[in-house]
Regions:
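Acidic-and-aromatic substrate-binding clefts and catalytic sites of carbohydrate-active enzymes
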Residues: 66-70, 98, 136-142, 165-172, ...
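Aromatic-anchored helix/helix-loop segment that forms the rim or "lid"
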Residues: 262-291
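Hydrophobic faces of well-ordered beta-strands that scaffold small-molecule active sites
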Residues: 49-53, 88-90, 130-132, 158-160, ...
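Mid-to-C-terminal alpha-helical segments outside catalytic/metal-binding sites
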Residues: 2-47, 51, 59-87, 115-123, ...
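Aromatic-lined glycan-binding groove of carbohydrate-active enzymes
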Residues: 234-269
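Catalytic metal-binding/acid-base residues of hydrolase active sites
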Residues: 54, 194-195, 244, 309
């Protein structure tokens, strides 16, 4: 073992020891499924892998949004057991304003979030994974946190929001060094929508979470494609939330209106780029969004997600039996595709 490896190993042991001392975290036919009265029986052997599952460190509040009470790992495990979910990959909930403020305060908040998530993963290694947060508009801070998250915390991937609330979307050229590093690491990037401050008043009395949240996913993916990020870093695996939001519905219009001067970024056409992305099904298993997604994207790209705890798990699983998926497709959605992305989650069952 080289000197650098020894340092990384020692750093990780010291980190876990210090956290322990703090005590932060003590396809079947549809008719064969049961998803009533708060119960879901997975088709996949070993149960579901939930890639859209939010944690909330102590002191980080939703300001009235989401389900009541402080999140705990035990709370999630209780719900996971109830719905046949064996593993959940944790990511930060709607708290971008705490971690994207582009200051040392934001860097410190990100570190707190990631160490909390890593402690949960360490305490329950067969129940939790981690998408580490980064202070996205802060390029230097993000690069340092990526190194810490991968080399010390051993995260499964990186979680970002669809914008930084300062007028920048993920494809912004100023963020190129971050994508370069994520590409070098062949990172799995989980992208969650977050409504920017510019767009909170577009709904005339209705919450922006009613519809704007799904437009944000489309906006962010568009920025990544038209600015060549996904073209330059093909080894990055990008996961989008909520069955892609409005992306599958607008894919035809996007193809017809794609800027000709940026055709070099889509050598096989726009739809080919959209089909490469991964899509979790959280709170988007109604027949309408699912029909749009499955008309364009192959089953190899579907992932199971719940958006717990801001959303009840029932809002996702109760609709799955009515989609008429085959056993093979259900198994891919519930577990097999995630096992392919995250080989360490292939636990014996």
């Amino acid at each position: 073992m080289g000197k650098q490896e020894v340092q990384h190993s020692t750093s990780r042991r010291q980190f876990l020891k210090s956290l322990a001392a703090t005590g932060i975290c003590a396809a079947a036919p549809a008719r064969e499924l049961f998803a009533q009265k708060g119960v879901y029986k997975p088709t996949a052997k070993g149960g579901c892998i939930d890639v859209h599952h939010h944690h909330q460190p102590p002191g980080f509040t939703l300001g009235g949004r989401g389900r009541a009470g402080q999140w705990t790992p035990q709370q999630s495990i209780e719900q996971m057991d109830k719905f046949g979910i064996t593993v959940a990959i944790l990511s930060l909930t709607q708290l971008g304003d705490r971690v994207y403020d582009n200051t040392e305060k934001g860097r410190a908040a990100v570190r707190t979030v990631n160490e909390f998530g890593a402690k949960c993963m360490h305490d329950y290694p067969k129940r939790f994974g981690l998408f580490a947060s980064i202070p996205f508009p802060d390029v230097d801070g993000s690069l340092k946190e990526i190194a810490y998250a991968y080399d010390t915390l051993k995260c499964d991937g990186v979680g970002i929001y669809t914008n930084d609330n300062q007028g920048h979307w993920p494809g912004d050229p100023k963020l190129e060094p971050i994508w370069q590093e994520l590409g070098r690491r062949k990172a799995i990037v989980y992208m969650h929508p977050w409504v920017p401050s510019c767009c909170n008043n577009l709904n005339y009395g209705a919450s922006s979470f009613m519809n704007e949240i799904d437009f944000e996913t489309t906006r962010a993916v568009t920025s990544l494609i038209t600015n060549g990020v996904l073209f330059r870093y093909p080894d990055i695996k990008l996961i989008t939330a909520h069955s892609g939001g409005t992306l599958p519905v607008l894919a035809g219009r996007m193809k017809d209106r794609y800027p000709a001067e940026k055709a070099q970024y889509i050598p096989n056409g726009l739809w080919a780029e959209i089909k490469k992305l991964y899509y979790d099904c959280a709170h988007a298993t109604y027949k309408m969004p699912w029909a749009a997604l499955t008309a364009l994207v192959p089953p190899s790209q579907y992932l199971f997600g719940t958006d717990y705890s801001p959303e009840p798990i029932e809002s996702t699983v109760n609709e799955i039996p009515g989609l008429g998926m085959s056993r093979d497709v259900l198994e891919m959605l519930e577990r097999k595709n995630a096992e392919r992305l995250f080989p360490r989650l292939r636990f014996k069952v």
